[in-house]
């Protein structure tokens, strides 16, 4: 999968499925499920590393997890999902040279094919322009931007007419600067529809209604593994309860010296 494939998907009206991955196991599961894009999101700071926000994760950690995701893929390279890696907080807000070095390192030292940046401030737009001119594919991200949590919080964004027009202008600017796709997070569905119609690049939504060109979800949220679910990303299964019950069953079997309840005794059970 290449960035240009997503544009063809939009032209054909084929919805784009994006899942997050943070290690080889989550990557293998998402690939087997048929995801078009695997996003190594800085949400791994919360999902995998136990932080309260995405801010603490470092570039080295993002690289480490991206390499692990790449190792989890099993299909031929041409058939693999597109790997997109978030540039973490302060890896691109402190100057174009630093941003190019960070993005270049992710692409050189892992199998990532693109990076994602949040926001459309003039400094970020300049970075996007520079990265694209250097041959680095960029995915944009507007609406709720978790790296700005201390300024904007986790509330719904662009809820009034002025902010909606501003976001639409920002989206058009990101396309003009060369972004190959755009994530819209936690914004009104009507606004997302307007953005989708205004852009030729794919618009990937999360909490932005059903009229986007695709959807992105944090895999752990979909599987119900997180203790607190985002209101715009309901779980499909109660994975947390399933896992706890399974592990609790094994603990009880071990303590009671009882065989597995399904009757199967594996070599691991015998050792």
From Swiss-Prot:
Cofactor binding annotation: Binds 1 Mg(2+) ion per subunit.
GO cellular component term of the entry, any: cytoplasm
Keywords: Cytoplasm, Magnesium, Metal-binding, Pantothenate biosynthesis, Transferase
Binding-site positions, Mg(2+): 42, 86, 118
GO annotation (BP), single: pantothenate biosynthetic process
Uppermost EC category: transferase
Pathway named in the protein's UniProt entry: Cofactor biosynthesis; (R)-pantothenate biosynthesis; (R)-pantoate from 3-methyl-2-oxobutanoate: step 1/2
Swiss-Prot/TrEMBL catalytic activity: 3-methyl-2-oxobutanoate + (6R)-5,10-methylene-5,6,7,8-tetrahydrofolate + H2O = 2-dehydropantoate + (6S)-5,6,7,8-tetrahydrofolate
PANTHER family named in the record: 3-METHYL-2-OXOBUTANOATE HYDROXYMETHYLTRANSFERASE (PTHR20881:SF0)
Cited function: Catalyzes the reversible reaction in which hydroxymethyl group from 5,10-methylenetetrahydrofolate is transferred onto alpha-ketoisovalerate to form ketopantoate.
Protein name, entry field: 3-methyl-2-oxobutanoate hydroxymethyltransferase
Source organism: Synechococcus sp. (strain CC9605)
Gene coding for it: panB
């Amino acid at each position: 999968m290449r960035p240009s494939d997503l544009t063809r998907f939009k032209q054909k009206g084929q919805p784009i499925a994006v899942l997050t991955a943070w290690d080889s196991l989550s990557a293998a599961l998402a690939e087997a499920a048929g995801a078009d894009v695997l996003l190594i999101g800085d949400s791994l700071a919360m999902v995998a590393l136990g932080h309260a926000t995405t801010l603490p994760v470092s570039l080295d950690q993002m690289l480490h997890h991206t390499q692990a995701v790449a190792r989890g893929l099993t299909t031929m390279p041409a058939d693999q999902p597109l790997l997109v890696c978030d540039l973490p907080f302060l890896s691109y807000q402190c100057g174009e040279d630093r941003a190019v070095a960070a993005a270049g390192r992710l692409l050189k030292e892992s199998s990532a094919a693109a990076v994602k940046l949040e926001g459309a401030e003039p400094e970020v737009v300049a970075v996007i322009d520079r990265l694209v001119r250097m041959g680095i594919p960029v995915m944009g991200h507007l609406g709720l931007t978790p790296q700005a949590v201390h300024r904007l919080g986790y509330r719904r964004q662009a809820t009034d007419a002025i902010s909606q027009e501003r976001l639409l202008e920002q989206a058009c600017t990101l396309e003009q600067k060369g972004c190959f796709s755009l994530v819209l997070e936690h914004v009104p569905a009507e606004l997302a529809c307007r953005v989708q119609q205004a852009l030729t690049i794919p618009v990937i939504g999360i909490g932005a209604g059903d009229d986007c060109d695709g959807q992105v979800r944090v895999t752990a949220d979909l599987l119900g593994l997180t203790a607190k679910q985002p209101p715009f990303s309901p779980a499909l299964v109660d994975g947390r309860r399933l896992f706890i019950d399974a592990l609790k069953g094994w603990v009880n079997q071990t303590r009671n010296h009882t065989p597995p309840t399904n009757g199967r005794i594996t070599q691991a059970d015998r050792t």
